[in-house]
Amino acid sequence: MDASKLKKVAGKKFGGPRKKSVTRSIKAGLQFPVGRIGRYLKKGRYAQRVGSGAPVYLAAVLEYLAAEVLELAGNAAKDNKKSRIVPRHLLLAVRNDQELGRLLAGVTIAHGGVIPNINPVLLPKKAAEKAEKAGTKAKSPKKATKSPKKA
């Protein structure tokens, strides 16, 4: 390159095409904003100092949890033959997963409803017997045999 053809720009040696900025999210291969999370960590005054790896790690953890919940909620929506995830699907996804259920045990999801559950003791006996038969293999009915008469 000929230096005489390029204009001199204030603060830089020569002007020219600007480099595309590479964010820390791109470097880490994440979708969640590492810079914004770092700013929140500093502003929140959780500690006097924040290490450079802390926002990257936190962004990765948050992204993983979000992806996990969304995948399970998408499966719940598909099971209900719906194409849109609603709070009910989020609740079903979280409560039916053991680890997420423990993590979010004290969390109330607005408009999520409750997990359907009926205690077997409260079910009518006929329904309970049918449920038991459905659970086990149905056997073919045997011919009734008379018991011997007592003399």
From Swiss-Prot:
<dbReference type="InterPro" id="IPR007125">
    <property type="entry name" value="Histone_H2A/H2B/H3"/>
</dbReference>
<keyword id="KW-0544">Nucleosome core</keyword>
<protein>
    <recommendedName>
        <fullName>Histone H2A.2.2</fullName>
    </recommendedName>
</protein>
<keyword id="KW-0007">Acetylation</keyword>
<dbReference type="InterPro" id="IPR002119">
    <property type="entry name" value="Histone_H2A"/>
</dbReference>
<comment type="function">
    <text>Core component of nucleosome. Nucleosomes wrap and compact DNA into chromatin, limiting DNA accessibility to the cellular machineries which require DNA as a template. Histones thereby play a central role in transcription regulation, DNA repair, DNA replication and chromosomal stability. DNA accessibility is regulated via a complex set of post-translational modifications of histones, also called histone code, and nucleosome remodeling.</text>
</comment>
<feature type="modified residue" description="N-acetylmethionine">
    <location>
        <position position="1"/>
    </location>
</feature>
<dbReference type="GO" id="GO:0031507">
    <property type="term" value="P:heterochromatin formation"/>
</dbReference>
<dbReference type="InterPro" id="IPR009072">
    <property type="entry name" value="Histone-fold"/>
</dbReference>
<dbReference type="Pfam" id="PF16211">
    <property type="entry name" value="Histone_H2A_C"/>
</dbReference>
<keyword id="KW-0158">Chromosome</keyword>
<dbReference type="GO" id="GO:0005634">
    <property type="term" value="C:nucleus"/>
</dbReference>
<dbReference type="InterPro" id="IPR032458">
    <property type="entry name" value="Histone_H2A_CS"/>
</dbReference>
<feature type="short sequence motif" description="SPKK motif 2">
    <location>
        <begin position="147"/>
        <end position="150"/>
    </location>
</feature>
<dbReference type="GO" id="GO:0003677">
    <property type="term" value="F:DNA binding"/>
</dbReference>
<comment type="subunit">
    <text>The nucleosome is a histone octamer containing two molecules each of H2A, H2B, H3 and H4 assembled in one H3-H4 heterotetramer and two H2A-H2B heterodimers. The octamer wraps approximately 147 bp of DNA.</text>
</comment>
<comment type="similarity">
    <text>Belongs to the histone H2A family.</text>
</comment>
<feature type="short sequence motif" description="SPKK motif 1">
    <location>
        <begin position="140"/>
        <end position="143"/>
    </location>
</feature>
<feature type="compositionally biased region" description="Basic residues">
    <location>
        <begin position="139"/>
        <end position="151"/>
    </location>
</feature>
<dbReference type="InterPro" id="IPR032454">
    <property type="entry name" value="Histone_H2A_C"/>
</dbReference>
<dbReference type="Pfam" id="PF00125">
    <property type="entry name" value="Histone"/>
</dbReference>
<keyword id="KW-0238">DNA-binding</keyword>
<feature type="region of interest" description="Disordered">
    <location>
        <begin position="129"/>
        <end position="151"/>
    </location>
</feature>
<keyword id="KW-0539">Nucleus</keyword>
<dbReference type="GO" id="GO:0030527">
    <property type="term" value="F:structural constituent of chromatin"/>
</dbReference>
<keyword id="KW-0597">Phosphoprotein</keyword>
<dbReference type="GO" id="GO:0046982">
    <property type="term" value="F:protein heterodimerization activity"/>
</dbReference>
<dbReference type="GO" id="GO:0000786">
    <property type="term" value="C:nucleosome"/>
</dbReference>
